Amino acid sequence: AGGEIISNYGQRDGVLHLGLDYAAKTGDPVLSSEGGTVVCAINRGGYGNIIEIDHGEGFVTRYAHLSQFSVAPGDKVAKGQIIGKAGDSGSCTEAHLHFELRIDGIASNPRYYLEK
C-alpha cells in the first residue's frame, strides 16, 4: 500500500485526523517506512488491526485497518519490508491504509518526514 493519499493529517469533519490515509485494496502489501522493532500487532478498536513500529529516538509509526499481520511484537524489520496487508478492519468505510507518525508519543504530520 502507499498509493494516492485520500485523506490528509489534520481537521476532518470537526475531528483531528492523526495520520495519512492511502488508497489500497484489501490484501495489498503494507511496507515499513523505516527499520525498527515491532511494538505491537493487535486489534485496537477503531484502528482495527494495527501494527506499531519503534524506530528509535522517540519515532513510532502506526499502520492501521490491516487485514493481516506479517510480523509479531519484538520482530526487527527493515525499511521496505512487508509487515502486513491492507484491509478495512476497525472503523472505516472502505479498505485503505491509515499511517501515523508519533514523536515522543505525540501525533505529528507524517508528510513533513516522508518528504525528507
Language-model segments: residues:
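Catalytic cores of peptidoglycan-degrading enzymes
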Residues: 2-116
